[in-house]
């Protein structure tokens, strides 16, 4: 399942310059994936679309994929949107433009589910975790204390609060999630 990301309080909600549209032709991109923003498209129909690549190193000035989680169900050549209400089944399809935002250190709060983290490196698995740092492979790992003079995208674990995910019935499913404060980008 894909990560669920909620923009709890982010500057990109008020500053348009922190929002862009990206496209990655090689693979699907989950929301919350750290991205390197490349060059602007030369296609006249997509002049505000930037090529992106998933982060593959500890780096700053990264963007996070974040599109409305409307799941697309494909049947042959037909595409149906909104039949599946579970945002964990959503992904940004390869080769199609998607939204992204640039986290601002000291301001932004995001909420993410367990799938945001590298396998076995979520805050529940890492006892005493207080920070989350991007790794050389672009994944995020919870760590007990911040790395001294860390040079990449980093978050402080602010709180653990569940996200209620609709499942097509009355009520919903409570899913573990963490609110993260951006401390470095």
Residue positions per predicted region:
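Surface-exposed, low-hydrophobicity beta-strand/loop segments enriched in small/polar/acidic residues
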Residues: 1-185
